[in-house]
Amino acid sequence: MLLTRALFIFYVTVVALPAKANDEAYLYVLGVAQDAGYPQAGCYQAHCMPGWEDPSLRRGATSIALIDPAAKTKYLFEATPNLPAQLYALEKEAPSEDYTFDGVFLTHAHMGHYGGLMFLGHEAMGGKNIPVYAMPRMQSYLRSNGPWSQLVEFNNIALQPLAHNKAVTLAGVSVTPLLVPHRDEFSETVGYLIKGANKSALFIPDINKWSVWETEIAQIIQTVDYALLDATFYGDGELPGRDMSKVPHPLVTETMQALSGLSVEDRNKVWFIHMNHTNPLLNPDSEEANTVRANGFNIAVEGIRLPL
């Protein structure tokens, strides 16, 4: 995967959406990789080496921010192990002197989605009742297991309850958690439907195969303006020795096939995100990335804005 700095800059320029518009709420992409980021710890294979040798090619674990200029608030979706860098990126986009950091929405208890909560504790930021929105099992896990329980006991975070398909209203934006099937060892797993004044987004960074979800993914995409979808693995053969059909994620090739009947307009709503370090979509010049774009889909990169 021979990425170059120039190619990366070109690619971001091509896909970045329009700059901030007045007081319109928007989503801001902070990370696009699977839980362990790119390059992954301990990976010194050819596909990881560009990231070690050129820091500009590194990618953080998947996270998006909700920024509301009218309400002067900002929220995170996911607290990743890359939280320090992602908070800095958010600070540059929405400075704390102008925006209040009003909370974190969690999807589930896998390392790349909640591990960054540790930086809110007294050894680091020393947060003061930072709202953390979580489903019941996720809340119970945080309350009952250290070191997370200390965040609750020391009032670094203030757990906020969520319920399936029950909207949380945040000034001019609503956030609705949707239960999705996944490896739920420690908590439920949810995606989020995020609705602004004009547009809406579906955020599902982790899910098992689309066929085991009670919701038809093609149908829901027709009802939203953006769909940031699980793209952990691209296709067959990506993990040597593994039967990719049994990996509990929808392959990008499977998702494209499932959505092939949609109009080009609807396919344009899809932004693939949460890419494993093996995923060739991390290389914007790869044959696979070209195939995705040729079929009308998008590949998320850090720094894009999705106006709501």
Residue ranges and their predicted role:
Residues 198-200, 207-305:
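Cap/insert and terminal regions of metallo-dependent hydrolase folds
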Residues 104, 134, 202-203, 272:
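Structural beta-sheet core signal
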Residues 23, 128, 152-158, 171-173, ...:
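A short helix-to-beta-strand connector/capping loop
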